[in-house]
């Protein structure tokens, strides 16, 4: 059987009791090592705590050699460990589909992930819309599909969780072209880079989806003892020093609940100024929606 086991967000002890008991009985244990990291535990720490040797599963192994992971799973117990919750990435869904095709049974042992723990900032989970991912921009590649999803969310008053890029065991274009098996150092997108990239796309698209005054929340090292939450404008967060990874960014919707505001202001340097930002943002967004509506009527 294939066991997909969530590890939680930070510490080796974040694993559930059922997850730990399952690991101990497995013949092989894989640790997925490219969609996220445990902030307070290295591979060796996990091995000592679990009493098991871990096999690192990078992107290439999971996406191109999944049959190697699943080998023998018809007869033996195989564990696949994922930081956060097992179904936080589509890659893990693909692994389950392949297991089904091979007639392999599987079970999932869930755990906390950024998708639910983000409520620690005070925003109500059912007030979130589509989650988006933000990748590192290059000089020639600046994908902006996230922009339209943020727009859709804000039009109906919903917040947007922005998941920030992680580069682990990535190769440069030069090394790929030369066939050199050399990998770049790990990179983790910071809050300030994420906010700057969002504003860069707004400047180029100019559809007034958000601006430097749009209220946002920086969530750093969620679930760890060094967790930090910062409330401010996108412009302020573009100059924020967010520190060590991991980070997520939230763009607020234009209809923030009073209870959410009461919770959020505790994370702002100037609570009254942050409240004013929220009020101003709601008013400005409604004006933009009205203008766009009139423009659509004229086109007809």
Curated annotation (Swiss-Prot):
Gene3D superfamilies attached to this UniProt entry: Cobalt-precorrin-4 Transmethylase, Domain 1, Methyltransferase, Cobalt-precorrin-4 Transmethylase, Domain 2
Binding site for S-adenosyl-L-methionine: 9, 85, 88, 113-114, 164, 222, 247
Coiled coil: none
The protein, known as: Diphthine methyl ester synthase
Keyword ATP-binding listed: no
Documented EC number(s): 2.1.1.314
Annotated function: S-adenosyl-L-methionine-dependent methyltransferase that catalyzes four methylations of the modified target histidine residue in translation elongation factor 2 (EF-2), to form an intermediate called diphthine methyl ester. The four successive methylation reactions represent the second step of diphthamide biosynthesis.
Pathway(s) where this gene product acts: Protein modification; peptidyl-diphthamide biosynthesis
Assigned keywords, A-Z: Cytoplasm, Methyltransferase, S-adenosyl-L-methionine, Transferase
Family: Belongs to the diphthine synthase family.
Subcellular location: Cytoplasm
Pfam families attached to this UniProt entry: TP_methylase (PF00590)
UniProt entry tagged with the keyword S-adenosyl-L-methionine: yes
Single GO MF annotation: diphthine methyl ester synthase activity
Swiss-Prot/TrEMBL catalytic activity: 2-[(3S)-amino-3-carboxypropyl]-L-histidyl-[translation elongation factor 2] + 4 S-adenosyl-L-methionine = diphthine methyl ester-[translation elongation factor 2] + 4 S-adenosyl-L-homocysteine + 3 H(+)
GO biological processes: methylation; protein histidyl modification to diphthamide
Biological classification of the source: Eukaryota, Fungi, Dikarya, Ascomycota, Saccharomycotina
Highest taxon above the source species: Eukaryota
GO cellular component: a single term: cytoplasm
Cited SUPFAM superfamilies: Tetrapyrrole methylase (SSF53790)
């Amino acid at each position: 059987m294939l066991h997909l086991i969530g590890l939680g967000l930070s510490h080796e002890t974040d694993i559930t009791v059922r997850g730990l008991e399952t690991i101990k009985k497995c013949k092989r244990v894989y640790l997925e090592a490219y969609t996220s990291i445990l902030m307070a535990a290295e591979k060796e720490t996990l091995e000592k705590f679990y009493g098991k040797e871990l096999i690192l599963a990078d992107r290439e192994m999971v996406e191109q050699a999944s049959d190697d992971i699943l080998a023998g799973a018809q007869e033996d117990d195989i564990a696949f460990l994922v930081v956060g919750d097992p179904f936080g990435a589509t890659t893990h869904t693909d692994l389950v589909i392949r297991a089904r095709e091979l007639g392999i049974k599987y079970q999932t042992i869930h755990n906390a992930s950024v998708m639910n723990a983000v409520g620690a900032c005070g925003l109500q989970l059912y007030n979130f819309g589509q989650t988006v991912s933000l990748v590192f921009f290059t000089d020639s590649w600046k994908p902006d599909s996230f922009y339209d999803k943020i727009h859709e969310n804000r039009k109906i008053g919903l917040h947007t969780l922005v998941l920030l890029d992680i580069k682990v065991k990535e190769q440069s274009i030069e090394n790929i072209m030369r066939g050199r098996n050399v990998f770049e150092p790990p990179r983790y997108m910071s809050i300030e880079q994420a906010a700057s990239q969002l504003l860069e796309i707004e400047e180029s698209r100019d559809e007034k989806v958000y601006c430097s005054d749009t209220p946002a929340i920086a969530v750093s090292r969620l679930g760890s003892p060094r967790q930090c939450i910062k409330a401010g404008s996108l412009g302020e967060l573009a100059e924020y020093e967010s520190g060590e990874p991991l980070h997520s960014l939230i763009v607020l919707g234009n209809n923030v609940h009073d209870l959410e505001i009461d919770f959020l202001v505790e994370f702002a340097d100037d609570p009254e100024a942050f409240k004013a930002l929220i009020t101003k943002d709601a008013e400005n967004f409604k004006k933009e929606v009205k203008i766009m509506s009139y423009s659509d009527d004229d086109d007809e």
